[in-house]
């Protein structure tokens, strides 16, 4: 339950009446923004400690000065408090919490929940919504190689559902014995499920068990004189034994380790996670963070909560976790919560010896190397930000940059892209595209005006306008942005700047214009601020081009059908519902198209001819 929702917050009264139960507390500033989330076994003691006398680091003192309100949520146990704390930190990303950002979104193999499931791969945490997950895999290439291997051994379908549902005869995969063709009923549910069960064991690393099971099925089929079936199992064994010779081995759970190394330097920290199976590193992952005012134990605590209490998907959890040396007493409660969530006991090793020590040293060396790369890149980026701030004569540091670019195809399918850079670098999740409507063909000025107007309108409402807005273009384009700023009265809130190639159109010789200033500026092509302008502009250009190409492709496919007399919106929708997409429709035969409700044989012939 939320204890405090009042606007007039009385801190003294709040602290005096706090509960001693376990729970989560949220610190809010005067704008109502959550600036810190924490958990406690005893909320009264923990929250009061922030306001009591005693030594506190500068970061905590700065945070306490900004607290305008506190909210708490009581939880049934310490375990639920850890889970809620972790979810709230990921949701709100408070500025005084230690925040982790994966260096990439890892791929997983997924077995879908269909009656006849398909095996495919997806990136990131959305994978678990699709079905049963296996992974994560180190790279896209590794997961694709596994898919290829699976297809050679287990004839489980990999096709999209839209393609699967549209089949009236087996596809090529069936002919080359890489699919059982459940789409046209050539395999029973029991036979398909048997293959699926063996595949799941294979993906879980139970290699010997898979070999034994297939061998038993082969001999049983032979005894029953089902020789074709026995041959299928024999072929599977041949491929599996070849893999065995390539040193694919069983995963023994007591020999699975997660090794977590931390390296700290100045106000930065890097965490390296090595996943070990049977003496081999099967995956390595890294996180680099700003860690001002934090020690190794607090960083380890935050990381363990982030990684093990979050939505990480793994079919094999480690029996052993090796950690860089930290204060054990400070993380024992968290360790118990992690074991409870995973559903198994974990052997926590904080002072490893012998063989285990070499893994920890390897993780710490990896963490150090990644931190060196991170700090070097961050230093260069900060120099560019500082240089741009100086050129634009800004008083405050630049926290957010947005850049607009327009792309169209021969005046049609106009797209405006907006890319976002923060003081931490490119923020891909915040990139946006705008479909530009109701303007004359090829009118870039009107497109810029519309896109900037829509962005400013939403930005004022959400209170998230950028510090700097870059417009790709020259005087004409920046004048359109200026007009929007005048309409909304924000001339002094956001610095506009445009970057155009000028008459010569030579890269590195771009002309620069500042908002409400007709002076034409040029900067040395090696100037850090100029390099940042070009970097952001090029990113916006690429983002616009990709969006515009998608739109052109969709428009072209749709227009093919629209030209056929008798195919209106309802029939177009029926075709898409049946086939799942234009690509599947283009592959369909006349008879297959005629199966769609409302499509006659004659109309099906006309539709087929459009694609052939």
Swiss-Prot record:
Organism expressing this protein natively: Francisella tularensis subsp. tularensis (strain WY96-3418)
Record function comment: The UvrABC repair system catalyzes the recognition and processing of DNA lesions. UvrC both incises the 5' and 3' sides of the lesion. The N-terminal half is responsible for the 3' incision and the C-terminal half is responsible for the 5' incision.
GO terms for MF: DNA binding; excinuclease ABC activity
Gene responsible for this protein: uvrC
Pfam family, one: HHH_5
Domain of life: Bacteria
Segments forming domain UVR: 208-243
PANTHER family in the cross-refs: UVRABC SYSTEM PROTEIN C (PTHR30562:SF1), UVRC/OXIDOREDUCTASE (PTHR30562)
Keywords from the named record: Cytoplasm, DNA damage, DNA excision, DNA repair, Excision nuclease, SOS response
Name of this protein: UvrABC system protein C
Subunit: Interacts with UvrB in an incision complex.
InterPro entries: GIY-YIG_endonuc, GIY-YIG_endonuc_sf, GIY-YIG_UvrC_Cho, RuvA_2-like, UVR_dom, UVR_dom_sf, UvrABC_protein_C, UvrC
GO biological process: nucleotide-excision repair; SOS response
Record-stated family: Belongs to the UvrC family.
GO cellular component: cytoplasm; excinuclease repair complex
Subcellular location: Cytoplasm
Domain GIY-YIG: 20-98
